[in-house]
Amino acid sequence: MYEEIRMKFTDIFIRRPVLAVSISLLMIILGLQAISKLAVREYPKMTTTVITVSTAYPGADANLIQAFVTSKLEESIAQADNIDYMSSTSAPSSSTITIKMKLNTDPAGALADVLAKVNAVKSALPNGIEDPSVSSSSGGSGIMYISFRSKKLDSSQVTDYINRVVKPQFFTIEGVAEVQVFGAAEYALRIWLDPQKMAAQNLSVPTVMSALSANNVQTAAGNDNGYYVSYRNKVETTTKSVEQLSNLIISSNGDDLVRLRDIATVELNKENDNSRATANGAESVVLAINPTSTANPLTVAEKIRPLYESIKTQLPDSMESDILYDRTIAINSSIHEVIKTIGEATLIVLVVILMFIGSFRAILIPILAIPISLIGVLMLLQSFNFSINLMTLLALILAIGLVVDDAIVVLENIDRHIKAGETPFRAAIIGTREIAVPVISMTIALIAVYSPMALMGGITGTLFKEFALTLAGAVFISGVVALTLSPMMSSKLLKSNAKPTWMEERVEHTLGKVNRVYEYMLDLVMLNRKSMLAFAVVIFSTLPFLFNSLSSELTPNEDKGAFIAIGNAPSSVNVDYIQNAMQPYMKNVMETPEVSFGMSIAGAPTSNSSLNIITLKDWKERSRKQSAIMNEINEKAKSIPEVSVSAFNIPEIDTGEQGPPVSIVLKTAQDYKSLANTAEKFLSAMKASGKFIYTNLDLTYDTAQMTISVDKEKAGTYGITMQQISNTLGSFLSGATVTRVDVDGRAYKVISQVKRDDRLSPESFQNYYLTASNGQSVPLSSVISMKLETQPTSLPRFSQLNSAEISAVPMPGISSGDAIAWLQQQATDNLPQGYTFDFKSEARQLVQEGNALAVTFALAVIIIFLVLAIQFESIRDPMVIMISVPLAVSGALVSLNILSFFSIAGTTLNIYSQVGLITLVGLITKHGILMCEVAKEEQLNHGKTRIEAITHAAKVRLRPILMTTAAMVAGLIPLLYATGAGAVSRFSIGIVIVAGLSIGTIFTLFVLPVVYSYVATEHKPLPVFDENKTTH
């Protein structure tokens, strides 16, 4: 009775065609309304938050900064929640602490938490520091780099225009977190003190500084309230111009006045000269626009472009501007390519189905499942607050081949009954009843496979949650269509006793031949079952080798139309050196025919390095891939001895990390000298390994430092205090901000310093004077002694331990996974006692993800096994079905290994290829379900043995298995020939599924029947239950 009711469920839709059509139309309508409401992104929303705490302490050395500023802040900040890691750099005059938050941490809450921790220790920080600046960003590279240059205006004037006119406009765009200015030469009122003239006037530094501060103050004078009129008071107590500041009286003795111009030169000039930028060889000022942690780069860039065009029209006649790099160009190109692939895959699937069916009328039945499923799933994306992104679009490509499977199986079964003499209506009723359970089982099995991906954490989980649920949603809808619309259409469109067309005859003839060949070969296999079983065992035994022989990486290297190059020079050099050293490199870059723009920023990200972004021409305008261009440029870079430089790919997934793809951090509580020696040995081993084309260590003792010792006894006899010495040296050398002035409505720093000629070498100290307690000038050199030492440029820390970071770019042919594995082994075997190691950049993400996908794969296998066990009420039958999984996986791995041998990009174990392997689990088990379900029914209803049942089932289900496999494989063919942005990732997942499904299907058709004959449950016909019979 239960069986009859269950099977009659599908009859409703055959008998009520309007109901079947209405259900499908409803899904299409809901899907169409969702299209305009879904956001378009590169990847699913992934919040990466990096908080930076910057503190300036002008004139202080790195050790002082670390002891009194960095360490105090670190201790407090470490108590904040959701920190992934914290690193810091203590450099002369500045402390920078970088806090990388865990993925998808609320950026506003994280910023507030860190800010509270900073404020808690501000009172414990030294006097003389500037207030710590706390900022939050996504941490990745800017989404857009824009250059500004002029043949008439100098860099200070260009920078001033950008700060006053351009930057404020970009900040009006929602989603812009930061606008960095590189090559900037910001204006400041520079006071170039003359130590000898000050000594001649008996003026001490405190006297000069006090006069400057006391005579430039902002006054809030309130209002005058009369009986009827109120007046606002404005008191001009600030300096408004260079002339006013120059005429400032520093001291007076009757008519003898000493003005600032008598002891110093005052001018409006550059605040500092820490970075230089060039664009295509021309000196420029470059803006980098960084989005907020939660912003959609595509939306932000879309708003920037019209604003930028408006800004260009406002530029002075002598100023020019270009967009040097736009990250969203590659994103939009990749999305466009994927959408195009969806169209191509649909056409190919249509042709393949036609080749198997041969009837234009019949082909409508499975083909309609494609638009209904693809459009219908959009309503699910909307309900889950998902977006249209590369992952959901990739899921739709895979779905094209999947969603027709169920409809094909239903169509084929109904068509078989029509050819057996049934009317289309009866064939639809009988055929759908027979196939309903396998269809539901296959749908549940596929959904079960993807569910573990939706439960994963980390980057992989964030990326593939939407992928998995999109694919599962499309499969669910296709199952609904297969059991509602497809049977109804079959009853209306298919004809009994109709004369076959020429194409139908050819198709039938060809498939008949295939069927007969398969039957013959299967019979041979079943006669030699032990040989086939041995073959299967051999295949299974090769799986560990096939896995281990593949390289691993987080994501394959893509041709993104742009790449980064980092140049490093010795720590002791200045910005002039690095700029000149990089000129030959950039000349080689610009002479490369595929290069469109070349940007070089000397002095970034550190004072002795250069950040370079090279933009290539459109993919259609060049024949060479990005990797080939980078390799050529890297080879030419080896001939430049002054600087170590290497190009590397922009990270495919923006995880808030910057720099080369591999960075290992050595940590210890020991002193920096010991750490530097250990790091140098580790670096030497890396260079000797031949696995890295570029390496750079951030802790080297090669920077000259003058250690000044004060004779406190002698200074005391003169009445000279340590505070006086500190203030004098600070005002002469550090370039500290004394006060600020208002010029044309904009605040500028007032910076005191001696001229460059008076600070070229330690000998300059002989011209510095202090004021003794009796008012006489005393040479500074008389109370100090100096010793030249070598020190690091900066003192880095990681997780509150002294650290040394080695950044590296693996050699071509060496994956980041292989490089990391070598580094882990090297560090484990060779680091001394008291040392540990960690990773940064892309390497950190790869290590953190670890075996997450392997666990997901195992979980998918377990879940689908349990689902099948429930369906078959057996443990052994699911084991037989699952035997096809290692067969398919071996096919995929063999293909990856062969292609990897020929250095084909994307043939590594990465998140895309591993997701392809997980997808294979669901696809290949469908074959086993189809065969085992028929075999089970044959045993229950016809009393056949296991061998007879599975042989019959394999022959009956050959055609739908071949059709569904061909449809799936054909739908993925465009991925194998993908070009342009994102092509390698699409190829990676495509080749795994195509190779695995094709080879796995061939193996399954022969191995599964053999295994079934040995392992499967013997299904006995159930006894008829008589409710009137009494048992004792």
Swiss-Prot record:
It is found in: Cell inner membrane. The chain crosses the membrane at residues 18-36, 338-357, 364-383, 390-411, 439-457, 471-493, 530-548, 853-872, 879-898, 911-932, 961-979, 993-1015. Keywords: Cell inner membrane, Cell membrane, Membrane, Transmembrane, Transmembrane helix, Transport. InterPro entries: AcrB_DN_DC_subdom, Acrflvin-R. Belongs to the resistance-nodulation-cell division (RND) (TC 2.A.6) family. It comes from Haemophilus influenzae (strain ATCC 51907 / DSM 11121 / KW20 / Rd). Pfam families: ACR_tran (PF00873). Residues 1-17, 358-363, 412-438, 494-529, 873-878, 933-960, 1016-1032 are cytoplasmic. Residues 37-337, 384-389, 458-470, 549-852, 899-910, 980-992 are periplasmic. It comes from the Bacteria. It is a multi-pass membrane protein. The keyword Transport applies. This is Uncharacterized transporter HI_0895. Could be a drug efflux pump. The keyword Cytoplasm does not apply. GO terms for molecular function: xenobiotic transmembrane transporter activity. GO terms for cellular component: plasma membrane.
